[in-house]
């Protein structure tokens, strides 16, 4: 019954949108999220995208699908992890010495591909940043060739420098 890790789609009175497909709480639009920082709606079609903190500098942008699963599963004894406190590995220290971005991403993957209803990320930082911020779509002619593109803030620089030139078309 918790709403943690979920994106809700409700009306102004807090009632569930009648088109939501989640089988449990009818207010739920998507589930399986770790730490959503922002939701932006693409102007061309109104589709919702989330900017989300992943573990170990493994952040994602995801196009939401009604009833879809974000894929977050912080289970222990996967990806090289041993037993974790309270059987939850989502908040282990994220600065392991000598771990490359790829090894960190495999250690606690943001999107667990075992889920058949997984919403695959539209973008993943591959372990190179430290926390996505809010997101927005650029609107107006002043943006030139970038009009209609999505931007997301990065709250810190991770290992290997800043990812540059990455975008969602």
Outline where the language-model segments fall.
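Beta-propeller domain segments
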Residues: 1-169
């Amino acid at each position: 019954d918790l709403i943690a890790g979920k994106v809700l789609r409700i009306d102004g009175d807090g009632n569930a949108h009648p088109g939501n497909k989640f089988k449990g709480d009818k207010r739920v639009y998507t589930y399986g999220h770790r730490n959503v920082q922002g939701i932006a709606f693409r102007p061309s079609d109104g589709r919702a995208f989330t900017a989300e903190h992943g573990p170990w500098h493994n952040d994602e942008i995801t196009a939401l699908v009604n009833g879809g699963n974000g894929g977050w599963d912080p289970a222990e004894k996967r990806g090289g992890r041993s037993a974790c406190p309270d059987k939850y590995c989502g908040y282990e220290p994220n600065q392991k010495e000598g771990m490359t971005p790829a090894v960190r991403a495999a250690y606690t993957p943001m999107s667990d591909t075992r889920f058949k209803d997984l919403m695959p990320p539209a973008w993943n930082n591959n372990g190179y940043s430290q926390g996505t911020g809010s997101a927005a779509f650029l609107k107006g002619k002043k943006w030139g060739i970038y009009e209609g593109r999505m931007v997301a803030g990065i709250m810190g620089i991770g290992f290997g420098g800043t990812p540059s030139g990455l975008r969602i078309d």
